[in-house]
Amino acid sequence: MTMKTLRRVAMIVLALLLCAPAIAQEAIDQNTLPPSRDPARTANGLAQTPPMGWNSWNRFNCKIDEKTVRAVADAMVSSGMKAAGYTYVVVDDCWHGARDKDGVIGADPTRFPGGIRALADYLHSRGLKFGIYSDAGRKTCGGRPGSQGHEYQDAITYARWGVDYLKYDWCNTGTRNAEEAYALMSDALRATGRDIVLSICEWGNNRPWDWGGKIGNLWRTTGDITDKWVGKHHYSWGVMSIADMNEPLWPHAGPGHWNDPDMLEVGNGGLTDTEYRTHFSLWAMMAAPLIAGNDMAAMDEATRAILMNHDVVAVDQDRLGVQGRRVWKEGDREVWVKPLAGGARAVLLVNRGEAPAAIAATWDQLGLPDRLGASVRDLWAHRDLGRRRGSAGATVAPHGVAMFRIQP
């Protein structure tokens, strides 16, 4: 019996049970945009814009418990994060307890004495959605019970708990085939009848952008992010290094299926506020999931201003769903462009250097006629700059950005 047949049989059984680089100048050409996807042709019709929310790992690692998660949920509501669009609260690794005699997974009774269902109910009562973490191996990255061999059983449990989002990792998987392993969990989640977003976290090792769109809603394209500007640090990558690896994958992204350059580090203290604005702007330009990773209960005003910049969030959440790309680079200066619904363009001027730099985006780079008049809005200054022809530019701070919305 083939793996595909096994999955089909398992789905039927479960349904019965549940019954109840340096680049040259390049213009944006509308003919090169990736085709729009009908939700019915994607994995499950969910995540038609990039998911937004919070994940526990970047800030708390394994030091997570229900008291912390409830405090985060309360802070997301009171701070305005929920109103800004951040709706998922995802509990990452180390929530697990043991499996019972029947193999059913439970929560760590010390960390989550009230149980996961009660926690999910609390988040839902606050108008938020609940996400959880598991792994395609026998054990998670943190050494807790993984889902290998328990995919349908765990999916049933997650659905009964009220889970809305599953981050599915790739530690301790041995010789498993990644596409088959993720397809198995995808089938299990769909068979429950509950809408659960599937986040594929296999670090880009097996080219998930080639197959993830028919299985999940987002897929990690790189190893883990770290709160550094650039370079590799142990097994993790700095912000700019991840942006460079994620950028060429733009043709694979679209509504319901997103490239995921990993969670945000904004507010965790390793970068300057200028660098965090660059980080956030790049993620928005790349139509990346905006999953905050800071301590929600201890946000300073600068962090709030970055994460809740409604103009920049709107670029990320644009309904056209096109991932932006770099169209010009010269030394440390770059121009990125993202087509938006209604014919507008988001433009990001990036200065990777150590000194201020003058950078301009030309209408040719944007795929617009040179003499066309267009209104320009500065998305970080929240200021309309009037109508321009031919180009829009700025003097950009070291490691900084200028970001515009250009509407013909």
What are these regions (language model features)?
Residues 11-20:
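Bacterial N-terminal signal peptides
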Residues 25-66, 70:
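N-terminal module-boundary/linker segments of secreted carbohydrate-active enzymes
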Residues 50-56, 85-92, 129-134, 164-169, ...:
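Structural recognition of the beta-strand scaffold that forms the well-ordered cores
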Residues 72, 76-175:
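Aromatic-lined carbohydrate-binding/catalytic grooves of carbohydrate-active enzymes
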Residues 128-144, 190-207:
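Aromatic-lined carbohydrate-recognition surfaces of secreted/lumenal glycan-active proteins
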Residues 150-153, 197-295:
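Glycan-recognition surfaces
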Residues 283-286, 291-293, 329-368, 399:
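Carbohydrate-binding surface patches
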Residues 387-408:
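C-terminal beta-strand-rich structural cap/linker in extracellular carbohydrate-active enzymes
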